Amino acid sequence: MPKKAKPAGSGKEEGPVPCKQMKVEAAGGPSALNFDSPSSLFESLISPIKTETFFKEFWEQKPLLIQRDDPALATYYGSLFKLTDLKSLCSRGMYYGRDVNVCRCVNGKKKVLNKDGKAHFLQLRKDFDQKRATIQLHQPQRFKDELWRIQEKLECYFGSLVGSNVYITPAGSQGLPPHYDDVEVFILQLEGEKHWRLYHPTVPLAREYSVEAEERIGRPVHEFMLKPGDLLYFPRGTIHQADTPAGLAHSTHVTISTYQNNSWGDFLLDTISGLVFDAAKEDVELRAGIPRQLLLQVESTTVATRRLSGFLRTLADRLEGTKEVLSSDMKKDFIMHRLPPYSAGDGAELSTPGGKLPRLDSVVRLQFKDHIVLTVLPDQDQSDEAQEKMVYIYHSLKNSREIHMMGNEEETESHGLRFPLSHLDALKQIWNSPAISVNDLKLTTDEEKESLVLSLWTECLIQVV
């Protein structure tokens, strides 16, 4: 494969071509990635592509393949997950369906070979060796610290949940049929080699997962081999399939995914209810009743459609004149379900406040800023119609890594604080300042100032400097 940068071809007459090929210099240090900040982590992950170039030319547009002749990076990638890691994980308690799937592609369809209950390494290895089955491990960041470290930083960078799956495929086999996903995908090749084929999307920026029949997808527009240390990105909706060629060692890769249900459409759905709620307080037309029997109509009437169109224009005008865009669910959902900050120790700094107790003469600063959201919502403790607005602060410091991206809604709870709307300006001061004197906070009394910072300090959200 060429070692110089080469743009992706169209894939029309000349056949499948690579997306983008780059050679990078070996990164220094034991991790081979830069964890100084979320942006530095992402920049090192896609190196040597520049972040600006990535978002201008590739993000949500087309695939990017970065092929690297870098032994240090290949070794680091290999440390993220190995086939042999399954043995120790099974001894900790892994269950079919929840934690691991065993499958293979047969005649263009996914055949699931799961057993019932607990997964045992010897059985997994038997299916892997004898049935040529792919082993898929769900959300390995729950168990592998370095993946936790990577994905936590990526969640800070994207402001969106970041999940992962490990796929281990034996030689001469394919685990999944051609399909497309509803997520932005970054693939890191960890062990062995894998043969990839990418096709034009039938549904660009798809909102759901779908299997596609071979006869529908045509010829691949990109075809290549991934080797340890290589990285592949493709947008949601990109049809793809991958196999481990016969005669080679098994392949292991991790798929890191993000931006599920994180579109402008999702954000509009999330914010429109808040806009209507506020507008209805001031506009009597929005409080007027709909025509009798409108809900019994098979189709909306012309009058109703015209009325709704007018309301939407009014809301659009109102939106342009305000800075208050209320996210009712997306902010809270993200913070509630994301990873807690990476901690190499016991995580005491996330649950026990440290340092000096903040006083009126203290200077304080926010910590774990990427793990906190501040939002204004109607008081959730009031059930009457005249709900007063409150300031809510949600954080992920106490989130459970063990259930990250596992859909355990009954085990998920929100962590945070609630303040009167009169505290909003003071909270914005803390958010927007590198450090600020407690005495300078925009609150009426000294007692309010001390009470505010003490509440934040108790939740480990600020520190005295």
From Swiss-Prot:
On cofactor binding, the record's note says:
Binds 1 Fe(2+) ion per subunit.
The UniProt entry's sequence similarity note says: Belongs to the ROX family. MINA53 subfamily.
Q: Which Pfam families match?
A: JmjC_2, ROXA-like_wH
| A single MF term (Gene Ontology) | identical protein binding
What PANTHER family does the record point to? MINA53 MYC INDUCED NUCLEAR ANTIGEN, RIBOSOMAL OXYGENASE 2
Q: What is this protein called?
A: Ribosomal oxygenase 2
- Where would you find this protein in the cell? Nucleus; Nucleus, Nucleolus
EC number, as in UniProt: 1.14.11.79
Has the keyword Manganese been applied to this entry?
A: no
**UniProt-listed InterPro entries:** JmjC_dom (IPR003347), NO66-like (IPR039994), ROXA-like_wH (IPR046799)
Top EC class for this record: oxidoreductase
Q: State the gene name recorded for this protein.
A: RIOX2
What this protein needs as a cofactor is: Fe(2+)
* Catalytic activity line of the entry: L-histidyl-[ribosomal protein uL15] + 2-oxoglutarate + O2 = (3S)-3-hydroxy-L-histidyl-[ribosomal protein uL15] + succinate + CO2; L-histidyl-[protein] + 2-oxoglutarate + O2 = (3S)-3-hydroxy-L-histidyl-[protein] + succinate + CO2
Carrying Phosphoserine, the residues are 309
Q: Which domain of life is it from?
A: Eukaryota
Gene Ontology BP, a term: ribosome biogenesis
- Where would you say this protein principally sits, based on its record? nucleus
Protein keywords? Dioxygenase, Iron, Metal-binding, Nucleus, Oxidoreductase, Phosphoprotein, Ribosome biogenesis, Transcription, Transcription regulation
What organism is this sequence from?
Pongo abelii
Q: Which residue ranges does the record assign to the JmjC domain?
A: 139-271
Q: Which residues bind Fe cation?
A: 179, 181, 240
- Give any Gene Ontology cellular component: nucleoplasm
